[in-house]
Amino acid sequence: MLNPIVRKFQYGQHTFTLETGMMARQATAAVMASMDDTAVFVTVVGAKQAKTGQSFFPLTVNYQERTYAAGRFPGGFFRREGRPSEGETLISRLIDRPIRPLFPEGFLNEVHVIATVVSVNPQVSPDIVAMIGASAALSLSGIPFSGPIGAARVGYINDQYVLNPTQAELATSRLDLVVAGTQNAVLMVESEAQLLSEDQMLGAVVYGHDQQQIVIDNINQLVAEAGKPKWQWQAQDVNAGLQARVAELAESRLGDSYRITEKQERYAAVDAIKADVVEALTGQDETLDVGEIKDILGALEKSVVRSRVLRGEPRIDGREKDMIRGLDVRTGVLPRTHGSALFTRGETQALVTATLGTERDAQNIDELTGERTDRFLLHYNFPPYCVGETGMVGSPKRREIGHGRLAKRGVLAVMPNASEFPYTVRVVSEITESNGSSSMASVCGASLALMDAGVPIKAAVAGIAMGLVKEGDNFVVLSDILGDEDHLGDMDFKVAGSREGVTALQMDIKIEGITHEIMQVALNQAKGARMHILGVMERAISSPRGNISEFAPRIHTIKISSDKIKDVIGKGGSVIRALTEETGTTIEIEDDGTVKVAATDGDKARHAIRRIEEITAEIEVGRIYNGKVTRIVDFGAFFAIGGGKEGLVHISQIADKRVEKVADYLELGQEVPVKVLEVDRQGRVRLSIKEASAPSQDAVVPEAE
């Protein structure tokens, strides 16, 4: 018999339910998590044995959305879900980041978490539900895991924090922040903000962490009722004798190598030390495990670097804790791009471009809740050469998608709206060198490239990555961390913003015990660093250029009556297609009659606008037009009278005398003055040649085209 065990509780304005014991009973653990009508089914499977030779923790998180959850069919020829979307990839990372640090060091068994969205309320995002479901499933599984964690979304509306705001509320919120953590500590923050202060951002983190305690309490109660026995796993004992021998051979040499400031030279020195130690020890005793020696060397390397920082000694590259690496800022570095910048900070460098396009260049995104259009794209590329390595080059990996999204969050708050700047904008960041915080270099480069392209952003933005080394109550916050400091430290804390406030905050913490004080110190130190970087950037370009690039399309906007839209488009799009070919422009028409004409040549744009005005001009009864014969039929002839409009001259209106054969009087392409006699209810135009030739007629004769 199926005996579901259920926990139900109020979470902000929503009802949250956790249910286990009904489905996927062959998985290590499974939970159906739901918030209102949004439900995510989460499974966890853990391998009982680690793979032989495994040297890292193989945790895989897959978040997947099923279109049936929204009562829809998938798009595409096969009508089936395919590769993960960018949104699914980002939420997979969102689940992974707070749970990964909670597995014990040395645990190398494969763990696979799958979160499947099976029902969706358009007002309730599935990401928070999936994070809580993954936490509950891992806690139930018995796998070594120092959870559970809670997760919460925090908005900021009318100067008040809002727990788990709906999609409608987020539209008016100045903040979209996701925070996850255990009972005692924050582990992960992901956010974008509308230029909030550091205190407001920190307040949101603390508020979200406080509110999610009810989630942790309910997961603990569910585990007490339905949890599986804890795995009998023990970390491998450290060989103290081997540890001492490795320290004797390597400690002082590693300390010296970490005084080498150039990255590749330092890496070569460290690799040589490790190779020497392995060779020396295995030469004395062939039974020693090379993997164990390397693990001890890695731990020793970490200890050497951290101890130096905590003692207040200079950092790896000789800087003090709050110093920023040397900056080099250049704009307009590529001649034919619409905007470009080269931003260099120490050994991290980003070549960033901005490209302007029309509305049809915008990205149409098909989501569970329906389609939406994105007018601002930011893509981040991290080729292997930027770290001096060889490797595969192809479609973007999870890391590139995640870093691109973070950089986009950092810039989004200062982008102009469509009414101010009717362009689609694509920013691409090519990381050409990397030694820490390439995503924040992308934020700086994006701001510079956008200003170089003439995009009227509200303010310049810059980003900085902070780090932390903490032992007991002793801690040091580091500004502008290197890649090694990120790897060997306890926190990666990225902040982007303008002089006015914060636009994005991302935090990943590897240890418990990060206090309110530490986060406050990090935010304040980051603000000082951001102001320094903005000062250097402003010396290169202080405001957006007054004009867009000569190679970018100029968008001209006119308004026509909405009942004239069909005339400009024509049957099957024939008129607008002919217009774009004739004028060499791009023409877009909105439902309210707004017409956008885009062209790199101003004369072409003006020509297109003039043609549209002719097409949409009202035909005046009694007015004489210069018509051109387009068709000859037995009962008369059809004339083009300008603006794509056509009228009929009946055979009786060709001449003052009786006409037996139209072709005796008219031929195709002939231009003749015609007078408008009538426009009927269906828009059909009656014309006359004989009335136009009467001596009393006015000589108002526009050219037909």
Swiss-Prot record:
Residue span(s) of domain S1 motif: 622-690
Cofactors required: Mg(2+)
PROSITE patterns: KH_TYPE_1, S1
Keywords from the UniProt entry: Cytoplasm, Magnesium, Metal-binding, Nucleotidyltransferase, RNA-binding, Transferase
GO BP, sorted A to Z: mRNA catabolic process; RNA processing
MF terms in GO: 3'-5'-RNA exonuclease activity; magnesium ion binding; polyribonucleotide nucleotidyltransferase activity; RNA binding
Subcellular location: Cytoplasm
Cross-referenced InterPro entries: ExoRNase_PH_dom1, ExoRNase_PH_dom2, ExoRNase_PH_dom2_sf, KH_dom, KH_dom_type_1, KH_dom_type_1_sf, NA-bd_OB-fold, PNPase
Stretches assigned to the KH domain: 553-612
SUPFAM superfamilies recorded: Eukaryotic type KH-domain (KH-domain type I), Nucleic acid-binding proteins, Ribonuclease PH domain 2-like, Ribosomal protein S5 domain 2-like
UniProt-annotated binding residues for Mg(2+): 486, 492
Biological function: Involved in mRNA degradation. Catalyzes the phosphorolysis of single-stranded polyribonucleotides processively in the 3'- to 5'-direction.
NCBIfam families the UniProt entry points to: polynuc_phos, PRK11824.1
Name the UniProt record assigns to this protein: Polyribonucleotide nucleotidyltransferase
Gene: pnp
